[in-house]
């Protein structure tokens, strides 16, 4: 109800407002509306009712509860379809908000008329079922209708007010717009209740006229049940099905009903009744009437629901709307629940054969022809019972008269079951033949039944079943309930306008359109789309002849409707209809096959059917056997004689046999003689015999005759209460008592069967006919008098005290006319009987005008009743609710109902009354083409020149619609009078307008006629002017026809001399009119008649520009072919291409460019086509233009570039496209992006991507600038929905910055950035990892350990974190002990480190760097090589994280692990998501980021060869102290970018990201290793030897923990000449290392820095299996790298490694390493493990703490898994990689934002606002002199390297990095490692940085390798004492190389390399070996930790 009320508010408001004119008019207050249908109905006369329910057409129908003034209630005809929708939506929302409370709304006020309880219940019910009854219309009358079954609602039997007001009956809903589900539901509930109390109330009833008796008794239960049943079960259909709970409430709800007379009745027999849809309420009611079978009977799905009566407000969040269509509930009294079905198999077989035949003339349907009682209905019902609607048979079949509903067996079978063939001895069935044939016939029947999707029974005594609107509505309702057509049901739910099209209201207005558009077209479309089964479907229609009894004066009967529609039926939708033999002519227009059931002589099968039935009856009843056996026994002879006698008498009538056997069974007929004389000879005699037995005396029949008269006269079944009141309405005194009435009714119970809705229906139509009419010669005994019945019904209506509703008024008129009681009085009284009848009706009701204008009476008018209404005083100029509130005359003129128009004109209707649109009846008739009505109206002096509100006269309307005859007539009419009066509008104007109208619509005949008008008088009649424009539209005939594409008219006009260049009023010539619409054929015609193809309009536009602007490709091509100039400009300087771009027509743009249009043309404002395309926002057009040479950085005169325009217009796809194409982000871009979060994300992501790219190339400084610039541009507020995305992006930027800072030896800043990231994302293990790395680099081991422990908690499985943790723990231990001399060098591994330890710290560092560089490089190379294949596979690595190195990557989807732990696959091609490479999260978080990000970020960059790399080897020479400032050749840039040598492998990050890239890390490595190896010093030592200076070996001192060694930057000169000796000898004990580092720091600040740089730069220089410089296989190195210790050899123990490494790491060296690794090893490297196992293995191998952090986790490993293990996360990598990662992962994001090429270091620093100096000092306390340099950007330049910044080496970044890698030192390698860790590692996944994993991984891997190599392989002494120079130097080199090598390789290496890094030599060898191994092992790191971090 709530919903109803809502609907009322919505609709009601509208409709009722509009309709208010009809009924009481007042709209209900909202609450009332809410109240429910009930309330509506009950509401006093509220039109609202009608409004509310969908069905109600007019409030008229609505049962106005209280007297309402006429005029108010009419509703608009067409309910806005949206009401339901709106109501549903609102209700849904309210339901969600209020939950169950909604139902609790106090119904009290709502139903003021009812008792509170009842009200509430009904309210609930109603609330629940908002559908209007109309929809649900059942076959029964509305509750308020006198005939309605529904109990009246009024409590008081006599209550006058209540009369209709309280009725909840669906009827009232009828009025409502929809079908009235609501009412229906309501009624159901009421009915249920009523039924419940029916018994009691009946007892209470007094005999008097008290209504109460009938009220309560009135089948409350039945209707309720029925309703409930149907609705609840079967009808889950109802819009809001009633929740079961309603049931209960309903039951309790209203026991009392309204007086019958108060109930609305259906239309008149003619069916013309105007009853509102309300009228349908009857139907509704019937539809929902309770089943007589009792609630217990299993109903469709009703079962359990019913029982729970707490249905109450379970509608909690309010049920979503259900279908608002309600099927009629049919009940066929002749078919009882005990009926059996015998024979007829041949019929089904024949039907099946005909429907399947290929003969189109007969396969569309079958007509079953037979006389009354021959079993037609039984055949239909048998198919229904076996069909999907079989459960409804329980409603259709009546209970047997003997069975009381209470005792119905719930489980009993459906009616019409076939009897068991137990009596096969006598039963031959109808099957002539064998069991096989019988089986086939049985199959045919079942096959037919399975195809049945809808059915309809026409019943003459239930008028609604005979009306076309109900037929259409019912069929649609059943179709959508058919399981085979669920797609149709879904479509109706999806498209509410279809439901509104099928609402009863729409069906009344235009049943053909409703059926065609609501049923046939949707089904046809669904069938074409293969959404419904590809099989035949069948609709069954029984009793077409019955519908003819209610044929309307205007409109179709069901059979004529089908005859018109059958041509539109799809071939797979078949009909099976039945018709009586006497009326079979009505079906002659149906192209169906006919089957006759009454040709007994011709068809042996009929005889066998009869025989089988006789056998069945005799064998199933011992009584029959006893009564027909002559001597107590039955022999075959007797049987044969009897059966042949009965068959002969029956002539084929099953009904005759059934009734005869019933008489025999009951003993009324005893056949003791063989003459069988006692057997009645016909059906008529059977009825006579029955009546004689029932009414032995005439007086006994006279007692019941009035009841029969009323039943016969009624239009629909009446309840006992209604009949009782009607009987008493005929007597003034001495009324019949209720008990007496009940006795009489009991006597009639065998003839008037009580239906489930408690109404009474004749047992069979033939009995009803027998009571009314007899054939000649038949006895007239028991003949009834229908006139008397009509009289009683008319009196009953007249004596009702409340106001009758429209439907009842129409019925009253019908009964008055049929009663004709004044016949013969006119002469006596002197007054015409028609006047007296008019007085009668006028005294009986007030709503005459509303009744006259009711929807049904408008569309299917009853002329006689309408005349009576007019005589009674109805307003003939009454405004209806249709056609813009047009007067009745307008509507009838529009519909073409000549008799009604004549009637209205006869009574003086205003001939010029207009609707709200200004149209008069003449205009409507002319527009519809009804010449006869036009003539009638013109005779009544209708104004010919009347203009409607659009300025159109009747002549124009006729011309617009092509009605030539009407045009001719109107032109010949007399216009003089009107013309003179108006003075303005003349006939000539009208003719000119008519010419234009006809030309525009293509009516050549009218155009020709108007041009050839005879000119009788030049002055008065002007012929139409062919070149003039009209005064209405301002068009000439040619411009109008050309613009509408009317080719024939254009030809005609040109032939008649129309000027081809004649413009219309707006100055447009025909050529432009037609070009604008794209009619190239007419363009051709005009050009052939001399039009200029390059003609320009006022704005200078040519036809080509117009066509391009409108996107008409065909016309553009045609014009170009005709020589149109492509270079012409309009007045603004725009060309055709400019226009096409401005409107985004790609196909036209392509065509114009292909034809030579200039893509760089600038208009007068300097805007190129690209500017205009960017403004429009079509990315494809932009892409096309850029690909075809458009200047992407073109600036127009207002200083705007295409990118700025796209940003300003928020065209994200264009922004992404332009950024991908290299557009620069300038100040204007940022300004335009303000307050556009989606654009900001794209731009920031682009910056990030650029930073990642620089980082990958090792240009850490540039990368830092980018990140800092991005942070600077970060919006300060207003993130809105994108808050999470921005936060993730910022975290990634901060982590990336931290990584870069660390690589730049600005440890303080690095730490601060990581801390800021933690503030934003406290649970970020990547941030902890990054901070730990920064702290470790600045030798705050304890603090680093703390952060690592936090990280490992957050991500326990992260190997990088575990590795680093081990190292840091080891370093802490080492710091605590005085520096211990490094363990004796292990074979070769340690030797290099130890050998040189003391000689020179610097040297050592350099050596280390060299080693690391070479080994790393080699490893990287090797790894890359190995990786190449595996890189793609790497499971864990989020590929996405690194920007694609090469274009191929773009295509490949990158997978990145999301921080959440889920992997995301990014297709870089797709431009939808923008994630920073670093963070997956980004991508996932904000797909908004924009495709651009993905694409551009990930777009692989072409491989670059960095000069350094190109050189065969890198020459690392530690720069002098100041060297740090110098830029070292970086290891090969990202593999992609590298020269062929380096191309082999991208950094691991990239690798992972780019697995698909052509430049695979492997290849890169291979090339690198191949080319470099030869050139490289054979061993890092040799490189060191080459270095210009070597650090003197400092005494080994315990490194001070507090002291942060600033890595000395060793200038590693990659020389082609190996210096093995030096390298090998350089091994510095740990202590020495520390000291050296310290002293070096002070001595060589810059050199340390340099060293650091080189160290970090260490590239995995794995040769593919090559030997490291000194000849050792790179594999080992690679392995160690992977493991995280680049130089560690297997020989080295983990502990050793850790010690050395830890000091080394702590030392400046370490820092340097980090950068190197970071760069080359993206997180992807480390993480890249083929499997977790690999990672684990590698981690174990790496062993060193550093390694641990480096340890790759399989990137593929689930981030979730990783997450669980906090240790896994590699915070180190994380910080950097995160940043980087972020960019890679949100590839698009990073790429998208292009940082300004130059970032000032200061600016980047500023962004973070972290004091560099403090950071430096902190990090480089020990190296104080150096630290400033390192920390300071000034020295940074030197180290700008490929190092991935913060591990952010997006693929792109990496790719780009690589090229730089060669050039730059790998200082960033370490940071890469870090990077790797953070985002890449799965643990990190959660963080957005996880996106970057690939790059991070590689970085990490490098880093790890580097660290491992440096720390592990180099002696710790070396590390420390040289200040890590060695590490930085040799290792750095190695690392650098590693980093340079593809990240993947690094990762692999990391995995594969042993942790032992003790000796550089070993390391180198290992590296070379490892690199080989790396190559060998797929580098698909699963998602190395780094990767995930990244």
UniProtKB/Swiss-Prot annotation:
A Pfam family of this chain: Ank_4
Intrachain S-S bonds: none
Residue numbers carrying Asymmetric dimethylarginine: 1563, 1576
GO biological process, one term: regulation of dendritic spine development
Family annotation (SUPFAM superfamilies): Ankyrin repeat, P-loop containing nucleoside triphosphate hydrolases, TPR-like
Claim: Phosphoprotein is one of the keywords in the record: yes
Region (Disordered): 1-85, 129-149, 396-442, 1372-1401, 1430-1586, 1692-1718, 1783-1803, 1821-1843, 1968-1990
Result after altering residue 961 to Q: In IDDALDS; uncertain significance
UniProt entry keywords in alphabetical sequence: ANK repeat, Autism spectrum disorder, Cell projection, Disease variant, Glycoprotein, Intellectual disability, Methylation, Phosphoprotein, Repeat, Synapse, TPR repeat
Biased composition (Low complexity): 1783-1798
Signal peptide: none
Ranges of Polar residues composition bias in the record: 419-431, 1469-1498, 1553-1572
TPR repeat coordinates: 1244-1277, 1291-1324, 1325-1358
InterPro entries xrefs: Ankyrin_rpt, Ankyrin_rpt-contain_sf, Dendritic_Spine_Reg/Scaffold, P-loop_NTPase, TPR-like_helical_dom_sf, TPR_rpt
One Gene Ontology cellular component annotation held by this UniProt entry: axon
Effect listed in the UniProt record for changing residue 755 to H: In IDDALDS; uncertain significance
Residue numbers of Phosphoserine PTMs: 169, 238, 294, 400, 1442, 1458, 1530, 1545, 1579, 1722, 1824, 1827
Oligomeric form and interacting partners: Interacts with KIF1A; the interaction decreases in presence of calcium.
Family: Belongs to the TANC family.
Protein name per UniProt: Protein TANC2
